[in-house]
């Protein structure tokens, strides 16, 4: 049998020796500091693959691309819905079971509410100042309270409805202008433009990020906005990386293993270079120059909040960190959901026919669909749910960290374990879903499909949309609005068909990103009266 070290290129020998030495010291410290436990059933770890001395499963993780593939193949070989991987003494617990996922985010929610403290998280959150990636504690609770009660309140979201409607109209204007020029629509790109523009409107009150306010008259992004959007996705793609450095970070920080430290630092700095001048200018306006006549967007809301003593509640640095987090959290889900949903509808014309029938019955063709129509668009929401189930935007829910020793599925979970709930492992699990790879929106309808409203939230963890528990997404309302409005406006406004120059429809999935391996390029034709198509509004 060939040894692991002889199969590695020479430069990795040195790195391996260093990792082995540091991991040995780390593991020894963990063993010595861990209290002695009796060997009963509650102390048995979940099943896992055999590992190397000291390093555990770290070498296999290091050599596998994409990293998520290693977890998936190992669990398949082990024939288990919960597994334990040993990365130099750090336990990574992976979950494919809805029952165990519910236990994790309900019964054990308090035990598992922490986040791993990683370089990527620290960089994006500017030393953990934002909510979503901060460790469980005072800062997390403060930012969650602010966002829940103010930023995502019914009052604030209603205030921003006009801004979202502008971008829903701009979406239609953009597609219509492409039809007039006989251009092919890149569904992924267009959906990302919509998500970006809506997020910028709600966050900063404008879609442009430069003072020059340069834009085209048809809805395209300017060069600065394109670059901003690009680096937002570059930053997002750093999460999660499952880099070996995540598990032995104490010793590998600064070594730029996998290049992830350099990537996340460079891209975060560029995102901030666009965001921060807007924030600094607005902070000065509100806190030094008397402010504006009224609060108009999320940034205004953050800046003007005060505590019971009249002191400003959120610091400028906290605002900046939270704005970066909002940027990377708000755009990818609607775009990914839109591309896959439209692709599945073109593959299954009967599903498309039912969706159009619902739109024509609920909204008609004499006006554009509005946010107020969303509660009545159950079939469209069922389509969005089915896409969430079978085509998630990421392999895993953002990692949780065990704050103390606990149990899951009857197995012992040590303090400090990283908890990874697999999205495809739930949504495509034949133990949970009949014919899991068949796209069938009807499975999400109850009764006649009309009486009981469909929501995008899946509280039973049979698949993951917005997660749940203390770390669940608190932007469910606005996320639902963005997703359903994007799909509804696309379908109501246009007939879609494959473009002859791009070959047959392919729903093949990229194994690393879970995106369509081949971006969806379509031709469009208007299906409404010409006077209903709005003009672009900057």
UniProtKB/Swiss-Prot annotation:
Phenotype seen when the gene is deleted: Plants have a bushy phenotype with crinkled leaves and retarded vascularization.
PROSITE patterns: CYTOCHROME_P450 (PS00086)
GO biological process entries: glucosinolate biosynthetic process; response to insect
Tissue and organ expression note: Highly expressed in cotyledons, leaves, stems and siliques. Detected in flowers and lateral roots, but not in the main root. Expressed only in the vascular bundles in apical plant parts.
Cited SUPFAM superfamilies: Cytochrome P450
Induction context: By methyl jasmonate.
Pfam families, sorted: p450 (PF00067)
TM helices/strands, residue ranges: 8-28
One GO cellular component term noted in the UniProt record for this chain: endoplasmic reticulum membrane
Tagged with keyword Lipid metabolism: no
Role noted for this protein: Catalyzes the conversion of the short chain elongated methionines di-, tri-, and tetrahomomethionine to their respective aldoximes 5-methylthiopentanaldoxime, 6-methylthiohexanaldoxime, and 7-methylheptanaldoxime.
PANTHER family referenced in this protein's UniProt entry, alphabetically: CYTOCHROME P450 77A4, CYTOCHROME P450 98A9
Protein name: Dihomomethionine N-hydroxylase
Species annotation: Arabidopsis thaliana (Mouse-ear cress)
Gene that produces this protein: CYP79F1
């Amino acid at each position: 049998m060939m040894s692991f070290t002889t199969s590695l290129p020479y430069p990795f020998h040195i790195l391996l020796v260093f990792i082995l030495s540091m991991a040995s010291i780390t593991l020894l410290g963990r063993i010595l500091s861990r209290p002695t436990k009796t060997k009963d059933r509650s102390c048995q770890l979940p099943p896992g693959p055999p590992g190397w001395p000291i390093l555990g499963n770290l070498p296999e993780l290091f050599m596998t691309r994409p990293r998520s593939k290693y977890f998936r193949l190992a669990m398949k070989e082990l024939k288990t819905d919960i597994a334990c991987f040993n990365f130099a003494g750090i336990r990574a617990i992976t979950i494919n079971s809805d029952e165990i996922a519910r236990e994790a985010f309900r019964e054990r929610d308090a035990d598992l509410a922490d986040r791993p403290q990683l370089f990527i998280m620290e960089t994006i959150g500017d030393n953990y100042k934002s909510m979503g990636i901060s460790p469980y504690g005072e800062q997390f609770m403060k930012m969650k309270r602010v966002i829940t009660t103010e930023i995502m309140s019914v009052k604030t979201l209603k205030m921003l409805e006009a801004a979202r409607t502008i971008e829903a109209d701009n979406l239609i204007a953009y597609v219509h202008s492409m039809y007039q020029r006989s251009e092919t629509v890149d569904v992924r790109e267009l959906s990302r433009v919509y998500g970006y523009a809506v997020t910028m409107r709600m966050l900063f009150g404008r879609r442009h990020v430069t003072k020059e306010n340069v834009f085209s008259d048809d809805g395209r992004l300017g060069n600065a906005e394109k670059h901003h959007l690009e680096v937002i996705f570059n930053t997002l793609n750093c999460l999660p990386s499952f880099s070996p450095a995540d598990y032995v970070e104490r010793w590998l920080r600064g070594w730029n293993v996998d290049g992830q430290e350099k990537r996340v630092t460079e891209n975060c700095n560029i995102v901030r270079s666009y965001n921060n001048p807007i924030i600094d200018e607005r902070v000065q306006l509100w806190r030094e120059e008397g402010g504006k006549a009224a609060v108009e967007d999320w940034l205004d809301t953050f800046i003007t909040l005060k505590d019971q003593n009249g002191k400003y509640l959120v610091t400028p640095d906290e605002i900046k960190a939270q704005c970066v987090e909002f940027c990377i959290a708000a755009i990818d889900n609607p775009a990914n959901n839109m591309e896959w949903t439209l692709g599945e509808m073109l593959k299954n014309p009967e599903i498309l026919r039912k969706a159009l029938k619902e739109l024509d019955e609920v909204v008609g063709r004499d006006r554009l669909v509005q946010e107020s129509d969303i509660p009545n668009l159950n079939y469209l929401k069922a389509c969005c749910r089915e896409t969430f189930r079978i085509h998630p935007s990421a392999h895993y829910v953002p990692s949780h960290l065990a704050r103390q020793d606990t149990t899951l599925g009857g197995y012992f979970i040590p303090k400090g374990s990283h908890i990874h709930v697999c999205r495809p492992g739930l949504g495509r699990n034949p133990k949970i879903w009949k014919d899991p790879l068949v796209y069938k929106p009807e499975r999400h309808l109850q009764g006649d499909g009309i009486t009981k409203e469909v929501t995008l939230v899946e509280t039973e963890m049979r698949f993951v949309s917005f997660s749940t528990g203390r770390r669940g997404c608190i932007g469910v309302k606005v996320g639902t609005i963005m997703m359903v409005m994007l799909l509804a406006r696309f379908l109501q406004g246009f007939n879609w068909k494959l473009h002859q120059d791009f070959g047959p429809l392919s729903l093949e999935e990229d194994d690393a990103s879970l995106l369509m391996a081949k971006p969806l390029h379509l031709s469009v034709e208007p299906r409404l009266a010409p006077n209903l198509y709005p003009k672009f509004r900057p």
